[in-house]
From Swiss-Prot:
Motif segment (KID motif): 643-645
Region span, Hydrophobic: 389-409
Descriptive protein name: Outer capsid protein VP4
Record GO biological process: permeabilization of host organelle membrane involved in viral entry into host cell; virion attachment to host cell
Lineage: Viruses, Riboviria, Orthornavirae, Duplornaviricota, Resentoviricetes
Superkingdom per UniProt: Viruses
Additional observations: This strain probably does not use sialic acid to attach to the host cell.
Amino acid sequence: MASLIYRQLLTNSYTVELSDEINTIGSEKSQNVTINPGPFAQTNYAPVVLESWEVNDSTTIEPVLDGPYQPTSFKPPSDYWILLNPTNQQVVLEGTNKTDIWVALLLVEPNVTNQSRQYTLFGETKQITVENNTNKWKFFEMFRSSVSAEFQHKRTLTSDTKLAGFLKHYNSVWTFHGETPHATTDYSSSTSNLSEVETTIHVEFYIIPRSQESKCVEYINTGLPPMQNTRNIVPVALSSRAVTYQRAQVNEDIIISKTSLWKEMQYNRDIIIRFKFNNSIVKLGGLGYKWSEISFKAANYQYNYLRDGEQVTAHTTCSVNGVNNFSYNGGPLPTHFSVSRYEVIKENSYVYVNYWDDSQAFRNMVYVRSLTANLNSVKCSGGNYNFQLPVGAWPVMSGGAVSLHFAGVTLSTKFTDFVSLNSLRFRFSLTVEDPPFSILRTRVSGLYGLPAFNPNSEHEYYEIARRFSLISLVPSNDDYQTPIMNSVTVRQDLERQLGDLREEFNSLSQEIAMTQLIDLALLPLDMFSMFSGIKSTIDAAKSMATKVMKKFKRSGLATSISELTRSLSNAASSVSRSSSIRSNISSISVWTDVSEQITGSSDSVRNISTQTSASRRLRLREITTQTEGMNFIDISAAVLKTKIDKSTHISPDTLPDIIETESSEKFIPKRAYRVLKDDEVMEADVDGKFFAYKVDTFEEVPFDVDKFVDLVTDSPVISAIIDFKTLKNLNDNYGITRSQALDLIRSDPRVLRDFINQNNPIIKNRIEQLILQCRL
């Protein structure tokens, strides 16, 4: 459980410098920037969610195959097939309205001679004669029309899929009969009181709407989809269909979860955003015919409005990004009218509106997730501006319009001039509208966009309305304020401490004995076996979870340790080094993608960037086809554990800080992987270099791309602990047998230990290089 929570935190929780994101958006003018905030992301490193708003409608999409459900008793709704999926139960279903219909389905296994069997139907013990001389299963449909009558065999379904069906429709009960794969359905028994028919189902079952009856017939005759036959499909109680979902209202506070100190509150709010543009008009010196620049400026606005009877005081700051620079030059003379630069916002521009109000939702906006908004669009039209020349008719700028469309919302630390509080930063994309703008008495006409001359026209403000929603982690005691840690001094002290810890951690590389390292790497490791020697594993997990929420950014090593946890979790209870020591994680799909990428074109494999990408992902394939050899993850984990054990300063509290910014490739950055076919080895490293050579002579041979693709798809991928260069050097200087070469190629830890015990300098040097690469 702890490792699951930790893995989720590593995967989802990181923080983002908002200012960097905004600068990037502005410089690249990108319209598709989406950052997953993760749970409890901090406001002072605000998460960014820029995505389309999904507006719920009343359309309900019914699943074709709903289930499986656990055995139960209930009144099935009319016009829904009950698809019965028994295992070896003798009584599959009982149904009655207690007036004129009693129906039961009995299951009889293949190859049963004529015999009398005892069944309990509707609380009564009955002797019923059954027979099944086929190799398929048989469903016997038994029926009676009164409580005093005896059950009669009505009809039979002979099935190799072992599936049966039951339906209430119109005024009849419907079932299947015949023999698969040609079984059919029609009504079995009529009743005047169909709605009161209650069923007791003794097997797992599915629910299929009658509108999808063709699929039900298909399942009866050919079987369930393969997905339904895996161990991952677990039946649930039918009551799960009756869960009542609380639909969030427009203005309300909902407690999502609560502990002794903290609670998650969902705030749903109506919102009215009023904003206006500001501009700066700078005139050049001289005779008064020339203007230097006319540009947009940030504009603050404060206003009040009613929200469900509550008076709300709101503040907004409007700014623009991605402006377009225009100019006009009427001539070279000092008396010729000209504007050196004037700004226009168009389709490639963005408008940002920071919003804050004094409601409860903004008082604890520190740890926030699930921030969404739904806003309408607004049209902004430009007005007239007169260029007052000393002599002559004045040029007049007029027209121009754009529409603002909601494109995303983030938490913002860019506060308004009125208050220094957390705010919401709404982002709007633009489309140009009619009329175009022009400058009267000049050549400028028919241009689209909103110029900075008079962007508000006659409007005091522009208004956008609708709603927003967020979930905030707040203290359980409403009198407490959520603490905000944004001290520069604290961050500098922390960086200094982390620097000292990294230096100590890296200096310990010289103290690791290689035989000890290999012995340790042979052990089955899971997430917390790396922290043996720490007094409390639980405390370590808690500390790491807390630190990760605060410190982990885009940590590659966080992902690496998460992968290590998944790939080694099954090994914690076994000392075997068999192929089962690695859980078959979701790497296969990742590698399949790589295989398709490589197979697509032989030329693309020869491209250096493609080679690098492929070789880095080779380790995913390696995990799913683990051999008896040692791999890079074993060494990484062993080095990490050894250094922690030797350290005098590293504790569970500081470990997440140390590795917060490290990446998995940096821990052992110079990796190499190989595949083996007969007497030929094909090797790839993360720098994009590929080798092919013979095992006996270490003579290089041409690298066959197609063969390599086939091998990495179908054969085990091995960590090249002793790489090709080291092997060739070892063979040239010492000479090694074919058997030793194969063992070294397979990274056999026993042979590695033998070479180290013999103080072989070439092998020792290679292992030392790997240890020294494990730096932070």
